[in-house]
Amino acid sequence: MKLIHFKSDFFKNSLILIGGTIVAQLIPLLLQLYLRRIYTPEDFGAFSIYFNLLSVFIIFCSLRYEAAVVLPKNDVESINVLSLSLLLTFSFGLLFLIFLFFFNNEFCEWVNFPHKYAIYLYLLPFSAVLFSAYQILNYWLVRNKLFKSSAINKVSRRFFEGITQVGLGRIKSSGLFIGDFIGNLANVLSGLFQINRKSKIRMNQISLRKMKFVALKYKDFPLYNLGPTLLSSIANILPFLLINKFYSTDELGYIDLTKMVLSIPLAFISVTISQVLFQQVSENRNNGKSIVGEIKKIGLILLDISILEIIIIQLWAPFLFGFVFGEKYSLSGDFSKILVYSFVFNFITSSFSSIFIALQKIKYYSVWQTFYFVLICSLWFFKHLSLYNFLEVYVTIEVIMSLMFCILLGGIIFRYEKVIKQ
């Protein structure tokens, strides 16, 4: 029996999204060859903090209801989950903008954001709303198996983001921040166009009564998934905020390049696979079918990609970073030899995290996320170490938590398979 059926919908959908993701991520990676020469490491360090903050705030926007768009058996219910998520997102964006209007300077002090870049924080609410809105729309595309449309949107975002960052780069550092905003705007507009063209949403099916109904039906998402997901997101960015606090923004700028390179193909392909897996597992669960086959196939692919990246980074990272981005960035290559293990384990766990939601076992995932946050917070007690040793402690925590994730997920899958066979 062949390991992977290349004609299966699961494989084709994965291939479409992965292909679009790779193209979308090649755009910023190739542009780094130019951007790293016109922006300073300090610019990238500040933008890294900005982007990390954005990744936290988007969790608040829809109270995690967006993940429930795929779950309902009928489209009417799903459309109202989508509408509820968008309503919450715009409400949060408005509140966040008002907060920044009155407390911008205090917020800069709290997150240790360089004051020379403080004006760009006003873009955060707008980018958060756009980013979250597209995530909501993308779940609708995934629900309707419009994976090609989702792939096109990813490319559109990176294309317009890249053009803006290059175009404004010769003027001032604002290009990085404005480029991110323009990219998110392009993503939403492209998503709306794709939905209107291929999967029209009927406005007469939306009502406050129905939104209230789905808000109560899927209340587990804000009650049990919002808090732990927020803690997990903070845990993902906390090590880098601590580096900015304990060491320097310049060093964070070098590590930011390391993160970007290691994230391709790892982080973004994991999101892509997770979305396809989410749709497939949700469908199988609704029909009482096994999910082991898909998980085994994708697991072997992830393992192969991870091993390949580790080998390349360990053998040639400092040389490649210095040769491609400039000699001073060989330091980023040194950092990558340590951080690569964190990224490959995150790659695997992120790809399978949607299974908890699809099987409606988010409480178990929430416990893991909370424990992960607690361990990451312990990094505060290692601030006396050198930067290299600090990174080694961080990676050790990541590996331990990833192994715990695999054990927990394995137990849940085993119980599910046992139930459907009875």
Where are these regions (language model features)?
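Signature of the first transmembrane helix
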Residues: F6-L63, F92-G93, L97-F101, E161-G162, ...
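Membrane-water interface segments that mark the loop-to-transmembrane alpha-helix transition
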Residues: S8-A24, I49-Y50, L54-S55, I59-F107, ...
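Membrane-interface junctions at transmembrane-helix termini in multi-pass inner-membrane proteins
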Residues: F11, A68-E77, V129-S156, G167, ...
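Interfacial segments at transmembrane-helix termini and the short loops linking adjacent helices
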Residues: Y39-G45, N104-L124, L315-V344
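Helix-loop junctions and terminal segments of transmembrane helices
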Residues: I59-E77, R143, T258, L262-N287, ...
